[in-house]
């Protein structure tokens, strides 16, 4: 972890440019996921409402942690979990015990000799529950929907026999908390649980089991009890009979229900997606492998809930679950999944731009218990999408361009300048991120008034604390749209991200500050996500805000601001404007020269004289700017109704020494109109584009058969790229793989080939990235249509194969520019 959440260079305004301290490894966790490290309160201890650990600010965290740990058999998540072959599991058998516990089986006793949960991926249960893609042998079902099982009995089932199914989760299962579920066969259970005999044939009994639509999600132990005139029998617990229960967007009684099949296919079942980055004018996109069905990922998701002891009784509520996930995907407070790092120094971990998916990250966390270095907003969001989709919540990854970060709850973005309109960086704690990525997940909100169901924002990037914890959401998108910042959770912060105003303050001669300009359309200018059933970009800005400048939009802003720390900010507005300013930057590729320009337009009927000042600096995508490396001053005369353009060329050699992550630059433009006193102010962010990787499939792809992909890359820079690392990942195609390829010369073209063995049929995506100290944010993707294996059900039995990390690969060929 970093020195402190506000010490990260590139993340918070006003920080010196210094390398981060290297995080010390967390202590190895115990097998149940708890850390050996003593001291400090756990996540749920800080968040619960019990008398011994209550925090007055912690009312938002839901149920008390009354499910104690420490006795009984646990059904917590095992590491690393079972492998994912699709071979038919044998019927589990056990000797069982009678009511006396002595193991004696009496004549006439109804003994359960075996159980078949019909858990194969090709069986009816998995297909009907839309869980057949999970690379697991265990039964995985969605709550509120029936499933079938077969019992192999010692004799014919009689009407006088009584059979009871039991599901248990946690170390201290209790009926009253829903952690011990008792289901009498043939009788109505409580809370929607019931079991019925479908068919009795000889010693075989076919049962249909109905789960509650409000059931706790997680991995349950399963047992069967029988009672007959000859005595009672209990089937012993068998790990092969553990049952995973997930949220169910297909069940109308589940509060996560989604009433559109195409939405469910996209937001629950799609294993890959697009994440957008860059600037509004220069949008980049990268394909992300969510991999929610990959072997081990479901165990990793449940391990996240276990890691800091989320009460099992609260795991049936998607509001609580999503809020915990938003806290645990980042490492602050609770040693969660990812360590955030915005410094530019990633020498002790992985550059956030190098990740191509969530699988490698989650499996590393599950395997070691250590937080994974490093992540930034799109990585946190990508992992959150994986976790929530895996658990059954319809979730999408959302990008907000020109995303504000309000640090003082004013609900405005305050930017301070000196008397000459030069930015005062030590005062500019608020920042506008070029883009910020979070998540929407779909659920009803019974904890809110009516009208706030549907999409809810969840943000795992650690920006500000909520109830003392670095987490954010779930927050109703509808409350954001209408400026209802008093609705929980964290609505003021998210509203400011999408719909605050940019307020420019100038220092006066007496040291005070005066508002000289308010930019009303600068924040949340475009909010996008991947479209359903395509790789196109969908504009969802209208869901978050009313049309810019409309009465409804202004009312929402002013309503929100009235609840902020500067409720009277709109009482002091600047003078009328008659000179307009437009800022542009030439679209350029990393390594090329570029041009920036400012257009001035005189809308008045009089001559105007404008003193213009341009400051150019590099900037982190978080809005934190570096040193100003070029500036230009010019006085422009404008005739009535005339316009003029001021340009500033920038050579590669001028910006190269100053480049930071994302290749972004910030142009601060300020001006003063001599005749009217009008102040002009504008901040314009742009980025240098990076090249893509070119991927080509060599031959047909068939389940279980080796095929090959070719990757081609041309270095756009005139300098050598050192310590180049490729990453390759694709659900159903390739477990996460790291390829160390050494150096690539300036303007050199390289080609490499990699083989892989598909394990699941259907359309798949193979994703690759390149990273080096000199160049990052380079990635590529190829669609791979995998044919089923001849004469097979389609699945290959090596789905749980190991990842290939740290392999050194020779180049297939090299070429010059």
Swiss-Prot record:
Entry membrane topology: Lipid-anchor
UniProt-listed PROSITE patterns: TRANSGLUTAMINASES
GO terms of biological process kind: cell envelope organization; keratinization; keratinocyte differentiation; peptide cross-linking; positive regulation of cell cycle; positive regulation of keratinocyte proliferation; protein modification process
Keyword Membrane part of the UniProt annotation: yes
Residues annotated as catalytic: 377, 436, 459
Post-translational modification: Palmitoylated. The membrane anchorage region possesses a cluster of five cysteines within which fatty acid(s) may become thioester-linked. It is subject to phorbol ester-stimulated phosphorylation and is hypersensitive to proteolysis, which releases the enzyme in a soluble form.
Cellular compartment(s): Membrane
Residue numbers of Phosphothreonine PTMs: 22
Modified residues (Phosphoserine): 24, 68, 82, 85, 92, 95
Cofactor(s) demanded: Ca(2+)
UniProt-annotated stretches for the region Disordered: 1-38, 59-105, 793-817
Result when mutating residue 289 to T: In ARCI1; skin phenotype consistent with lamellar ichthyosis
Cofactor note: Binds 1 Ca(2+) ion per subunit.
Keywords associated with the record: Acyltransferase, Calcium, Disease variant, Ichthyosis, Keratinization, Lipoprotein, Membrane, Metal-binding, Palmitate, Phosphoprotein, Transferase
Region described as Membrane anchorage region: spans on this chain: 1-100
Taxonomy, superkingdom: Eukaryota
Gene Ontology molecular-function annotations: identical protein binding; metal ion binding; protein-glutamine gamma-glutamyltransferase activity
Reactions listed under catalytic activity: L-glutaminyl-[protein] + L-lysyl-[protein] = [protein]-L-lysyl-N(6)-5-L-glutamyl-[protein] + NH4(+)
Effect after changing residue 389 to H: In ARCI1; skin phenotype consistent with non-bullous congenital ichthyosiform erythroderma
Listed EC numbers: 2.3.2.13
UniProt xrefs under InterPro entries: Ig-like_fold (IPR013783), Ig_E-set (IPR014756), Papain-like_cys_pep_sf (IPR038765), Transglutaminase (IPR050779), Transglutaminase-like (IPR002931), Transglutaminase-like_sf (IPR036985), Transglutaminase_animal (IPR023608), Transglutaminase_AS (IPR013808)
Resulting phenotype, residue 42 to Y: In ARCI1; skin phenotype consistent with lamellar ichthyosis
Role: Catalyzes the cross-linking of proteins and the conjugation of polyamines to proteins. Responsible for cross-linking epidermal proteins during formation of the stratum corneum. Involved in cell proliferation.
Disease as annotated in the protein's UniProt record: Ichthyosis, congenital, autosomal recessive 1: A form of autosomal recessive congenital ichthyosis, a disorder of keratinization with abnormal differentiation and desquamation of the epidermis, resulting in abnormal skin scaling over the whole body. The main skin phenotypes are lamellar ichthyosis (LI) and non-bullous congenital ichthyosiform erythroderma (NCIE), although phenotypic overlap within the same patient or among patients from the same family can occur.
Family recorded in the similarity comment: Belongs to the transglutaminase superfamily. Transglutaminase family.
Protein's name according to its UniProt entry: Protein-glutamine gamma-glutamyltransferase K
Source species of the chain: Homo sapiens (Human)
Protein encoded by which gene: TGM1
């Amino acid at each position: 972890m970093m020195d402190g959440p506000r010490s990260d260079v590139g993340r918070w305004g006003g920080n010196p440019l210094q390398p981060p301290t290297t995080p010390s490894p967390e202590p190895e966790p115990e097998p149940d996921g708890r850390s050996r490290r003593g001291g400090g309160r756990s996540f749920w201890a800080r968040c619960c409402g019990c008398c011994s650990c209550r925090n007055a600010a912690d009312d938002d965290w839901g149920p008390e942690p009354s499910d104690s740990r420490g006795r009984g058999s646990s059904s917590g998540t095992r590491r690393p979990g079972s492998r994912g072959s699709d071979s038919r599991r044998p019927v589990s058998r056990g000797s069982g015990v009678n009511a006396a516990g002595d193991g004696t089986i009496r004549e006439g006793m109804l003994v359960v000799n075996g159980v078949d949960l019909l858990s194969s991926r090709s069986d009816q249960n998995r297909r009907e529950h839309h869980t057949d893609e999970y690379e697991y042998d265990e039964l995985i079902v969605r709550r509120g929907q029936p499933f079938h099982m077969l019992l192999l009995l010692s004799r014919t089932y009689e009407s006088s026999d009584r059979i009871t199914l039991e599901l248990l989760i946690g170390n201290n299962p209790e009926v009253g908390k829903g952690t011990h579920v008792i289901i009498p066969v043939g009788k109505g259970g409580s809370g929607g649980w019931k079991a019925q005999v479908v068919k009795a044939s000889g010693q075989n009994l076919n049962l249909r089991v109905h789960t509650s639509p409000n059931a706790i999600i997680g991995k349950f132990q399963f047992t069967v009890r029988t009672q007959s005139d000859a005595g009672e029998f209990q089937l012993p617990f068998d790990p092969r009979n553990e049952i995973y229960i997930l949220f169910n967007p297909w069940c109308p009684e589940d509060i996560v229900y989604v009433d559109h099949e195409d939405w469910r296919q996209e937001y629950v079942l799609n294993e890959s997606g697009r994440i957008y980055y860059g600037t509004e004018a220069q949008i980049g996109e990268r394909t992300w492998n969510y991999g929610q069905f990959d072997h081990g990922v479901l165990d990793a998701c449940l391990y996240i809930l276990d890691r800091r002891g989320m009460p099992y009784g609260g795991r049936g509520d998607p509001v609580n679950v999503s809020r915990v996930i938003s806290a645990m995907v980042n490492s602050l407070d609770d040693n969660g999944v990812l360590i955030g790092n915005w410094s530019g120094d990633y020498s002790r971990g992985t550059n956030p731009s190098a990740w191509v998916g969530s699988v490698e990250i989650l499996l590393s966390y599950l395997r070691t218990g250590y937080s994974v270095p490093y992540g930034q907003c799109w990585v946190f969001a990508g992992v959150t999408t994986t976790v929530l989709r895996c658990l059954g919540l319809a979730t999408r990854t959302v990008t907000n361009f020109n995303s504000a970060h309000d640090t003082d709850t004013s609900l405005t973005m305050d930017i301070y300048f000196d008397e000459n309109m030069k930015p005062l960086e030590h005062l500019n704690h608020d920042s506008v991120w070029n883009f910020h990525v979070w998540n929407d997940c779909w659920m009803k909100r019974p904890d809110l008034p009516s009208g706030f169901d549907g999409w809810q924002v969840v943000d795992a990037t650690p920006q500000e604390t909520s109830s003392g914890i670095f987490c954010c959401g779930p927050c109703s998108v509808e409350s954001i749209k209408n400026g209802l910042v008093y609705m929980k959770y964290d609505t003021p912060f998210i509203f400011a991200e999408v719909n605050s105003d940019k307020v420019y303050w100038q220092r006066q001669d007496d040291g005070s500050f005066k508002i000289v300009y308010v930019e009303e359309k600068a924040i949340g200018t475009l909010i996008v996500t991947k479209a359903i059933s395509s790789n196109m970009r969908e504009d969802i800005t209208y869901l978050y805000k009313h049309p810019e400048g409309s009465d409804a939009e202004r009312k929402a802003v002013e309503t929100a601001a009235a609840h902020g720390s500067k409720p009277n900010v709109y009482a002091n507005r600047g003078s009328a404007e008659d000179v307009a300013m437009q800022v542009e930057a030439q679209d350029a590729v990393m390594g090329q020269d570029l041009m920036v320009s400012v257009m001035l337009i005189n809308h008045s009927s009089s001559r105007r004289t404008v003193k213009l000042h341009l400051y150019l600096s590099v900037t982190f995508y978080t809005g934190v700017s570096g040193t100003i490396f070029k500036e230009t001053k010019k006085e422009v005369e404008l005739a009535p109704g005339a316009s003029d353009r001021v340009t500033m060329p920038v050579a590669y050699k001028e910006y190269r020494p100053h480049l930071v992550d994302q290749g972004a630059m910030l142009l601060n433009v300020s001006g003063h109109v001599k005749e009217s006193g009008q102040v002009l102010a504008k901040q314009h962010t742009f980025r240098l584009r990076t090249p893509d990787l070119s991927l080509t499939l060599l031959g047909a792809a068939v389940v279980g058969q080796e095929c090959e992909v070719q990757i081609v890359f041309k270095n756009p820079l005139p300098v050598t790229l050192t310590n180049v690392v490729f990453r390759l990942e694709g659900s159903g195609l390739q477990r996460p793989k790291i390829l160390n390829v050494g150096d690539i010369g300036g303007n050199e073209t390289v080609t490499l080939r990699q083989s892989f063995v598909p394990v699941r049929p259907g359309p798949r995506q193979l994703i690759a990235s390149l990273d080096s100290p000199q160049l990052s944010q380079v990635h590529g993707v190829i669609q791979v249509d995998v044919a089923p294996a001849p004469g097979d059900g389609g699945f290959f039995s090596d789905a749980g194969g190991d990842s290939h990390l740290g392999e050194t690969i020779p180049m297939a060929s090299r070429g010059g520019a």
